[in-house]
Amino acid sequence: MDKIRTVSDTKRDFYNHHTRPINSIYRRFIEELLVEMHLLCVNIDFRYDPIYALGVVASFQQFMQGYRPEEDKNSIFSALCQAVGGDGEKYRHEAQTLLNQVKGMSVSDLIAMGNSARTGEPGEGMLYNTLQAIAKNPQFKYSRLFAIGLYTMVMEIDADLLKEQDKRNETFSQLCNGLNLSSDKLQKDLDLYRSNVDKMGQLLAVIEDALEAERKKREKAKQEVATTPEDSPAN
């Protein structure tokens, strides 16, 4: 019997793959995402799927905005996926494939596809196959990251719809019905996600203002040095 990996094992693997220091402002998010992915991957009912992958990618992109140095982000994402036995390129490729498939669709089309997948009607493509596998799996392990993936697909189709609470709730209620999922937990997770996105946006604005103020301060100091007359030489 294989030994179940611990959170410590996963964290150690992560820091073995990404060896550079992590910006302190973002460290908590990265470690919380890592733990969340770990707990899912060691759950006997969890099965990786492209909607979950999209949730991981979208969450990372959303909450890593403004990270410096920018070039470290790819290494961090790859390390997150590798630490739980995954492949960052696969996550990104399948996430983008889903977004490409929903382009040109309406939200009604997406809901109808979910209903067709549940009833076993013929269909094709990664999105349809994923929806059908979920709808047909009574042991499907729901996760917050799956909810974010579903949310990201709807955003790709109609971002304005998500701004109206009644329409948003009705949309996800219908999607959950098609997938044989309870919508209550999903909608609570999405409300929290939206709130955290807003808070992150506010934090980034504060950081940018502080950086701009510091830049202006340095520029002013340089100008003052440049315009200060040199002392006249002593006779």
From Swiss-Prot:
Keyword Iron: no
Superkingdom field: Bacteria
Keyword match Coiled coil: yes
GO CC terms, sorted: plasma membrane-derived thylakoid photosystem II
Stored InterPro entries: Thf1
Keywords in alphabetical order: Coiled coil
Coiled-coil positions: 179-228
GO terms under biological process: photosystem II assembly
Functional note: May be involved in photosynthetic membrane biogenesis.
Alphabetical list of PANTHER family matching this protein: PROTEIN THYLAKOID FORMATION 1, CHLOROPLASTIC
Similarity section: Belongs to the THF1 family.
Name the UniProt record assigns to this protein: Protein Thf1
Source organism: Rippkaea orientalis (strain PCC 8801 / RF-1) (Cyanothece sp. (strain PCC 8801))
